[in-house]
A protein has these predicted regions:
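Rossmann-fold NAD(P)H-dependent dehydrogenase/reductase core
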Residues: 1-165
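Terminal hydrophobic/aromatic helix or amphipathic segment near a protein terminus
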Residues: 168-170
Length: 170
């Protein structure tokens, strides 16, 4: 995929870092790998979206976090913290956190801090929207407290998904 992008754009500086966003050790290692190679970072786009309707009960990660929360909230926030120094070195450092159009379905939703891991009641959809709300709230926090870095949260509209990847649902 990187080679195809290099050819299409003419940019030889296209690379990737493999990371498991549900594993905070992997997130730390990926950030460190980037920090070792680069002097600055212009844009960090946090676009994680772990949302599987077939999951009927919370899955805990090695770190003891609910998997969707780890992937959709903890990892983007940790990456932002770890890469903050390189973003500050950029003339136009910015973080773009991708939220969800689906939050419009829940205009009065509040974060349920007592149920972040689904310990009381688990719903993959509600957990996902709670995660996206948490990421939005973290974006507002960072925007207020992190000077010199532009912080944006955007919501995307519905995305066409290849349902064949969910063959376990039929």
């Amino acid at each position: 995929a990187c080679e195809k992008i290099r050819q299409q754009t003419g940019n030889p500086h296209v690379d990737y870092i493999l990371v498991d966003l549900s594993d905070m050790k992997s997130v730390r290692e990926a950030a460190e790998q980037y920090i070792q190679k680069e002097d600055f970072l212009d844009v960090l786009i946090n676009n994680a979206a772990d949302f599987d309707l077939s999951v009927k009960k919370p899955i805990l990660t090695k770190d003891g976090l609910e998997k969707q929360f780890a992937t959709n909230v903890a990892a983007p926030f940790l990456l932002s913290i770890l890469l903050k120094g390189l973003l500050e070195k950029s003339e136009s450092g910015r973080i773009i956190n991708i939220s969800s159009q689906g939050l419009m379905l829940y205009p009065f939703m509040k974060l349920d801090f007592e149920n972040l891991a689904g310990q009381k009641h688990y719903s993959p959809a509600k957990t996902y929207y709670q995660n996206k709300l948490a990421l939005l709230m973290l974006s507002l926090y960072m925007r207020k407290h992190w000077k010199g870095i532009k912080i944006q949260a955007i919501r995307v509209t519905n995305v066409k998904v290849d349902m064949r990847r969910y063959d376990h649902l039929s």
